UniProtKB/Swiss-Prot annotation:
Protein name: P2Y purinoceptor 12
Residues in the Cytoplasmic compartment per record: 57-67, 125-148, 214-239, 305-343
Region of interest (Disordered), ranges: 324-343
Organism: Rattus norvegicus
One of the protein's GO biological processes: cell projection organization
Lineage: Eukaryota, Metazoa, Chordata, Craniata, Vertebrata
Localization terms from the record: Cell membrane
Topological region Extracellular: 1-33, 89-103, 169-191, 266-284
Length: 343
């Protein structure tokens, strides 16, 4: 999310807060390189998440884990659908109305889905910890209902948090080239935007602590299991359990860099504490780490495949059916060559 305090004077210059110095910035990276990178994510994410959604809607919601994964794939698909608007807007290929749409709707939706994904990764982490410590416990109907209610509550909370950001982005642009979404926000819209920024930071850091604590406990439990079964026939099962660490890998690759880069970047926008070169570096770091948050939509399918047995079995069954169907069709088309040979 962009901080209201910053003031960009044109597409290639930006003013350093608290000074009259204009800091030139080369936007070729953000107008060419990042649109290309987002295009790759869009096609890869659309294919993998469409397939994941198709599979998940064939699987019963028989555990909290599957319920949380289903919500995650919906969130990822919504995020992916915002990419084309960002690509066209950043590449300066759309009209001013497109930039207004991005600021008012798709950019808000992007962050809305990001923090939903972060929240569900936190819940999935808790679920995996409970599965590690109590592997034979099954989900009761009351637990499943609780997971569904919690999922609805997360969506409702984030929607109510994000909706004012859409409504309060209601100023008419004075210039066709809108360099910052904050120029379109009302006075209260800027205040609400800042409040939402703080709340989203809290959401991230809460889930960051959940991931750190749960994986510390999971590591401890897996080590105890290793010591107990060392040298026994259960060793292969322990190696399978290591797959659970894919969640923390995705969380740290996608979300941690952005939220650490965001702190000095926000400071550079609101206070004159960095020189021009440092400001530009922080800007590019912020844009790079923001792309990593988008990468989450392409990495989550690996979580589904490695950690969800029902998903993996359904996918393999689908692939086998497709392969056998293709072979059968090929056989029917080819037939027996002797039948086509004239006497």
């Amino acid at each position: 999310m962009e901080v209201p305090g910053a003031n960009a004077t044109s597409a290639n210059t930006t003013s350093i807060p608290g000074t009259s110095t204009l800091c030139s910035r080369d936007y070729k990276i953000t107008q060419v390189l990042f649109p290309l990178l987002y295009t790759v994510l869009f096609f890869a994410g659309l294919i993998t998440n469409s397939l994941a959604m198709r599979i998940f809607f064939q699987i019963r919601s028989k555990s909290n884990f599957i319920i949380f994964l289903k919500n995650t794939v919906i969130s990822d698909l919504l995020m992916i659908l915002t990419f084309p608007f960002k690509i066209l807007s950043d590449a300066k290929l759309g009209a001013g109305h497109l930039r207004t749409l991005v600021c008012q709707v798709t950019s808000v939706t992007f962050y809305f889905t990001m923090y939903i994904s972060i929240s569900f990764l936190g819940l999935i982490t808790i679920d995996r910890y409970l599965k590690t410590t109590r592997p034979f416990k099954t989900s009761s109907p009351s637990n499943l209902l609780g997971a569904k209610i919690l999922s609805v509550a997360i969506w409702a909370f984030m929607f109510l948090l994000s909706l004012p950001n859409m409504i309060l982005t209601n100023r008419r642009p004075k210039d066709k080239d809108i360099t910052k979404c904050s120029f379109l926000k009302s006075e209260f819209g800027l205040v609400w935007h800042e409040i939402v920024n703080y709340i989203c930071q809290v959401i991230f850091w809460i889930n960051f602590l959940i991931v750190i604590v749960c994986y510390s406990l999971i590591t401890k439990e897996l080590y105890r299991s290793y010591v107990r079964t060392r040298g026994s026939a259960k060793a292969p099962k322990k190696r399978v359990n290591i797959k659970v660490f894919i969640i923390i890998a995705v969380f740290f690759i996608c979300f941690v860099p952005f939220h650490f880069a965001r702190i000095p970047y926000t400071l550079s926008q609101t206070r004159a504490v960095f020189d021009c070169n440092a400001e530009n570096t922080l800007f590019y770091v912020k844009e790079s780490t923001l792309w990593l948050t988008s990468l989450n939509a392409c990495l989550d399918p690996f979580i589904y495949f490695f950690l969800c047995k029902s998903f993996r079995n359904s996918l393999m069954s689908m692939l086998r059916c497709s392969t056998s169907g293709a072979n059968k069709k090929k056989g029917q088309e080819g037939g027996d060559p002797s039948e086509e040979t004239p006497m």
